[in-house]
Amino acid sequence: MQHTTFHAFCIAAPRSGEGKTTASIALMRALARRGLRVQGFKCGPDYIDPTFHAQATGRPACNLDTWMMGRDGVRALWDSRAHDADAAVCEGVMGLFDSRDPGDPAGGTADCARALGLPIVLVFNGRGMAGSVAALVAGFQLHAVRMGVRLVGAIANNVGSPRHADILRETLERSNLPPLLGALPRREEWRLPERQLGLLPSEEAGTTAAWLDALAEMAEQHLDIDRLLALTTSKRPEAPAPLLSENVPPPAHGHRQRQGLCFYYEENERVLRSQGMGTRSRFPPLADYGPGRHSA
């Protein structure tokens, strides 16, 4: 059953490593457990985070990249994947205003959010911070206006105590800045496993439904999800026209998928299916098995 309201927002951060992936997964899972159909998105060419989004929501996630796809391409993909959802959550990449070129915002989180008109929730590491949170949020709010995007709230990560959270919240209130929508306490068990070049893929990380549910419960306890939803109500995207496909027998296709060879774009699969490609199967390329029964 489709809810009458639609919510959409972007989770961003001042830089990588602030906790935006954990916050994104926790919110996606919490919203899904509330009975909403949640669609996850990831800014940029990241193969790993969407696998966690898919586990949290039960729906395939997809990438949005204004550098590779252009703004019109991003909007079209957003419409095609979000039109039948109740909430769409887009996780940013790196810092909110980072991009491949300091003079060109293409490919960055802010550019993607601007193309889609998404309000932004800033996740930041609150460890060792008190009154300085006002300068941090004020700076991001000011530059957001310059970049044509809107900051509607913040979430503190690695908060030491309820009193610490209160200090951060009161500071933003007194400074007339976007509100603190929650404060996540320090918990080692909530950390996603990492390696040199980023997070481990979900298959290697061994994430379970119980772990995802624990994140959702953490979000319900420490985040003001109702207020977040009230701040991010949006117009539901319209369903796009289907892609042209030929009325021909669909050929089977396969792709390699195993540890170390599991990176692919979900959107590529959708386009193949829309063009008449039939059954997809995954095969382990390192085993004694080949794609001989496939057309492609």
Please name every model-derived segment.
Residues 250-296:
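Phosphate-binding active sites in nucleotide-utilizing proteins
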Residues 130-245:
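Internal gly/pro-rich beta-alpha loop/helix module
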Residues 69-72, 186-192, 286-289:
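A short acidic, often aromatic-flanked loop/helix-cap motif at beta-alpha or helix-coil junctions
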Residues 27, 31-32, 172, 272-276:
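Hydrophobic alpha-helical packing residues
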Residues 2-116, 120, 124-153, 160-166:
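ATP-dependent carboxylate-amine ligase catalytic core
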Residues 4-7, 246-252:
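A short, charged/proline- and glycine-enriched loop
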Residues 56-57, 116, 175-177, 274-276:
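Short, structured coil segments at secondary-structure junctions
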Residues 44-45, 94, 158-159, 185-190, ...:
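Glycine-rich beta-alpha junction loops
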